[in-house]
Structure formats: C-alpha cells, structure tokens
C-alpha cells in the first residue's frame, strides 16, 4: 500500500463526521444502475485530486478482488474551477468516497433526454421571425453570418457530410457509444438551425459534433459533463474560448453536477444555450435549464405565443421559435420538428452571429440577446419573460 493511499485512508477516517452529502435521485428520474457523479470542493488542487483518484482506485481494486460488482471510475472531469469523476460504485464505496474531506457532494448519474416532441410537414418560419420585429417572410442578416465562430453541438451527433454544412462540420467527441453518427436526427436538425446554409442563422460558422445522446435520444449525466469538459478544452487548445458557442438541446431532472459543469463553460468565455424543456412546467426543476449563468430558451409559436409544451418560469431568459421548425436531417434532405430543442439553437445561432458581427465575447452574448429582444410573447407563463429573440437587423 502506497503512502498516498495510507494518507487518504487516514484523512477519510478522520472526516466521517463531515461527510459530503450523497444526494438522492429526484422522484421519477431514470438513473444509471449504481452510477454516481462525484464533485470535489472548489479548493481541491490537482495534486489532491490525483491523490484522491489513486485512493479510489485502491478501493476499487479491493472490491474486485473480493468478487463484488463495480466498474470503478469511468470518466474524469478537470475544469478550471471544478474537478470530479463518474463511475459505477457499490454503496459502501460511495460512502467511503463521501467521507473524504475534499469531496463536495455525490449524486446519482441520471439519464438526460433530448427535448423534441413532434414532427410535422410544414414550411419554416423561424428565421424570418427572428430578423423582423413585427414578423415577415424574409430572413435579414449581416454578411458576416457567424464567420470565425465555432459551434459545439452537444447532442445526438451530427451528419457532418450533409450539404447544409458545406464542409464546415467536423466530428469532435463521442461520450456515449462507438457510433460516430446521428442515430435520431435530433443533433443534425439542431446543427442545421445554428449554421446550415439554408435553414441556419450563422451560415458561416463551424459546427463541431459532440455526441452525448444515443440512438434513443438518451445519455447519462456523466457523459454530458464529459462532453462539456471536452468542448471547453478543445476551444482552449485552439484559441477559441471567446469565439465559441455551445448548444445543449437536452435536459433532465435537477443535477448540481451538471449545472456546475455548464457554468464552467460560461466562466471560460463560451456562450451556452440550453432548452427549457417540454413538460409545460417550471424549468427551475430541470438541468441544465435551471443553471442561472446559461441562456435558457423556451419555445414560441408562429403567432408569438408560448408553445403548449414549453416549460416556463424565472429561469427562462428568452423565447425563440420552436414550433414546426424545418431543418436538416441525416442522409440529406430536411424534416420538421417541434420542441424547446428547436428554440435553443435559434438563440445559439444568433449568439454566434453577433459574436462575429459585433466582436462581443461569448460570455456576454446572452446579455446582448436580451438587450436586442422584443417583449412580444402574449402568454409566457407565470413569472416568465415576454421577450422574443431578435437578431438586431433593424427591420
């Protein structure tokens, strides 16, 4: 047994009375069996984090040697101001982990889903609406069109060969399976709204596919966090932190870990757009929609009303078109989808557009969107903004 392991065993034994909270899964939440996310305290150094992982590996080795079930650590997260990991652990191991004084909290690894509700055949209208204060049939935009901005689509994958992207889409990371493709069409539709040549807002932006949802449109919270972590690191490595946007048209039950991870992207300088959810309830109970620093987007209809399915509440920053939205589908062609999943990429696209046009950093883009927005939603829901997305075209 190494010195670091002995040291950590000693510290854990001394800290039982100060054990970190082991959160319960929200009622009705689908969770990964024996899956947990462990978040360290803010003041945990890289050295302390490394020592903790050595100690956890030692515990896991002892478990497997005794023939008990448990896969151990599967993913590690290392943001600027947040460190943690996820994995499969038995209850005794999780109890030991929670006793480490460097652990802030432990929560179940819940399943996250895409926010799409219906598909119909109908003409698009969202682009023209966001570029005209009182509505119109034409999409009016500046020729910069998101040039020089990177859009990370944290979703079900993207058909990067689709003609809508004209070679501007690339594969980034896969945190959920070994299929580098879009199994649901959701991510491709979202990407098309952000940056497609026909259906997109920021028509010159680069699209980066970050797959976190499987062919059923679901994925573990741990994988979503890993996708965010990868996106931040990739933007940093390429000098794009303040010229990048992230879209997450997904959500699930409240997760402190997911909210903390999403906030790290904002702190790093990246704009983040998330969908409010499709349950017609207060979005304060969902993640990542409830994270205050992100831009949470609810869905509007063609007549500037709240879409019947859209979540609402004080967490909502803006409304954007989310009903009967036409965009790209895998394999070529297009399809119509509805949902707050379709509203969020409208905001993400306008953010990318404004970053390129006005030179604002991504971390300030949500504020700029709210400054430009118009108070036209006529039935927004209790304690909810009336403001509708607008690109500032002057029309």
Curated annotation (Swiss-Prot):
Compartment annotation: Secreted
Xref: Pfam families: Inhibitor_I9, Peptidase_S8
Family: Belongs to the peptidase S8 family.
A single MF term (Gene Ontology): serine-type endopeptidase activity
Keyword Hydrolase in record: yes
Principal location: secreted
GO BP term (any one): proteolysis
Protein name: Subtilisin-like protease 5
Keyword terms: Glycoprotein, Hydrolase, Protease, Secreted, Serine protease, Signal, Virulence, Zymogen
EC assignment: 3.4.21.-
Glycosylation sites: 229, 247, 391
